[in-house]
A protein has these predicted regions:
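Acidic, glycine-rich loop-and-beta core segments that form the ion-binding/anion-interacting portion
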Residues: 1-66
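Glycine-rich cofactor/substrate-binding loops
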Residues: 30-31, 43-203
Length: 203
């Protein structure tokens, strides 16, 4: 059960490493800002920087913890002829493995406490992402029996930056009821949610 415990904690740590990296990335592209802490140094050469140091520390300490925990999980079920003493050597590192995990959790909590969403930056990206409307358009096209609906939207939008005009030009080529066409033209990247709200409420 001790080995199983370390395997489970290592998996949880891995999930949190993924979270720390994602949050670091969102900070880097401006989706989140961090509250400044008086006296904190973000960079040794760039005084203006507010680095995501807590998320970097969390990632590093989760990594060290997992290196120990994965070894504990793999080593403890094995005993040479059921009598060797390597377990006692390895078990001396239990405290370190748990300690690094706790340090990482504290860093993560501290970092989360500094986060503030930058709604303007997020909305700016969303408002320019007209290609997300390919989903409702191809769904309506299928409903009205238009062949190769998915493929048509894929050819139009995949790897492309769309805008309102280019999307509306495509809509004008479709044989759809007028009311349906106007409903699609009224959609914007900001207003279209699809099933996002329903799926989020089910988490």
């Amino acid at each position: 059960y001790v080995a199983e415990f370390f395997d489970v904690v290592a998996r949880l740590n891995t999930i949190l490493v993924d979270y720390a990296r994602d949050t670091w990335s969102y900070i880097s592209i401006g989706y989140f800002r961090q509250h400044q802490v008086a006296g904190e140094i973000g960079s040794s050469t760039m005084p203006h920087k507010v680095n995501p140091i807590d998320f970097e520390n969390a990632e590093g300490n989760f990594g060290v913890a997992n290196a120990l925990m994965q070894h504990l999980g793999a080593k403890l079920p094995i005993s040479r002829w059921q009598r060797d003493l390597t377990d006692s050597t390895v078990l001396r590192n239990v405290g370190s493995a748990i300690g690094y995990t706790l340090i990482a959790l504290n860093s993560l909590e501290r970092g989360i406490g500094k986060l503030q969403p930058d709604n303007d930056a997020q909305l700016a990206d969303l408002r320019n992402a007209w290609e997300v409307l390919a989903e409702p358009i191809q769904t309506v096209m299928r409903r009205y029996g238009i062949e190769n609906s998915y493929e048509a939207l894929k050819d139009l939008t995949r790897g492309q930056r769309m805008d309102r005009e280019s999307l509306h030009r495509f809509l004008d080529t479709l044989t759809l009821p007028g009311a349906e066409l106007q409903r699609l033209k009224a959609l914007t990247p900001e207003s279209y949610l699809g099933l996002a709200e329903k799926l989020a409420s089910e988490i």
